[in-house]
Design a protein with these regions (language model features):
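N-terminus-biased detector of the onset of the functional/mature region
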Residues: 1-85
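Compositionally biased terminal segments of proteins
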Residues: 2-5, 22, 68-293
Length: 293
């Protein structure tokens, strides 16, 4: 088994995995929320720690430019200039996520959580730079989206409208939390199938459970992205291994194998199963310790 870090022994990692398996989905989400808030807050202030006189608006705009690019930063700065009441708030993914979930519910559009947030619920929790949601909004939703999102998010209305017309993704930036939400439409047969195997997870106390892609589908989505990144994104590979290790005892390996062939990542899946200690080098099922099975 390849460990998540070269400094961690397989024995200690097995203890970690056994402990993570005792955590509820809500606790895992809280961990991702806490990690994200701590690391994003540090990144927000790190480059400007000595600039005590920097205005909060300039600090926020500089952070947005550094993390998300100049285009979104310009839209952001223009928008907050029109909001004298604007104040920077802690970068909380839960608070950044709730408004779009409420709008999706209002429009009766299923919103499926994917990306690093969903992956961390099944594997080793880590911080998330943004939140990815699979949601099939259409042109008939434009007016409602523009009306209901404008208070909570920064976005280009023209870009959003074009995205719905052409069935492409679009981004929202929470106005005070500075967390980016990427909305991704169902554009492939595989993405359409994700909803069929969705998991209903109680992630937020006092809220209805959220729809989350299954552990198997999160593995496949990460493998597809890893392949697109040239098979050399170590962080994403660690995410893949984390899901496989933590979920090894309940994974549907037959489904994983079938779907991996359909999306052309069967070779990567084979290597991931070996690195995660689930398969031997010859492809046979590994005799994993009880703490891993």
């Amino acid at each position: 088994m390849r460990t998540q870090s070269i400094d961690t022994s397989p024995e200690f990692e097995r203890i970690q995995i056994a402990r993570i398996r005792t955590f509820s989905a809500e606790k895992m989400f809280k961990s991702v929320r806490s990690w994200t808030q701590s690391i994003t807050s540090a990144n927000l202030h790190s480059a400007y720690g000595s600039s005590d006189n920097m205005q909060e608006r300039d600090l926020a705009a500089s952070f947005v430019a550094r993390e998300y690019g100049d285009y979104l930063a310009r839209i952001f700065f223009t928008a907050i200039e029109k909001r004298p009441e604007w104040r920077l708030q802690p970068p909380d993914i839960q608070e950044a996520l709730l408004p779009i979930l409420d709008v999706a519910k209002y429009l009766n559009v299923p919103a499926l959580l994917i990306g690093s947030v969903a992956g961390s619920i099944y594997g080793f929790p880590r911080s998330a730079q943004d939140v990815d949601i699979l949601a099939d909004f259409h042109t008939e939703h434009v007016t409602s989206l523009l009306e209901h999102l404008a208070h909570s998010y920064i976005f280009d209305p023209h870009v959003l409208t074009l995205a719905l017309q052409h069935h492409t993704s679009f981004s929202l930036l929470h106005v005070s939390r500075l967390i980016k939400i990427d909305i991704i439409p169902h554009s492939t047969v595989f993405e359409n199938a994700l909803l069929e195997r969705r998991q209903i997870q109680p992630l937020i106390e006092g809220r209805e459970p959220l729809l989350v892609a299954s552990a198997e589908d999160m593995t496949l989505l990460n493998l597809i992205q890893y392949q697109r990144q040239g098979n050399n994104a170590d962080d994403r590979w660690n995410d893949i291994l984390g899901i496989l290790k933590v979920q090894a005892h309940i994974l549907d390996l037959a489904y994983l194998d079938r779907q991996a062939q359909r999306v052309n990542v069967e070779g990567l899946l084979s290597q991931a199963l070996i690195d995660a200690g689930i398969h031997n080098e010859d492809g046979s099922l590994s005799q994993m310790p009880a703490s891993i099975r």
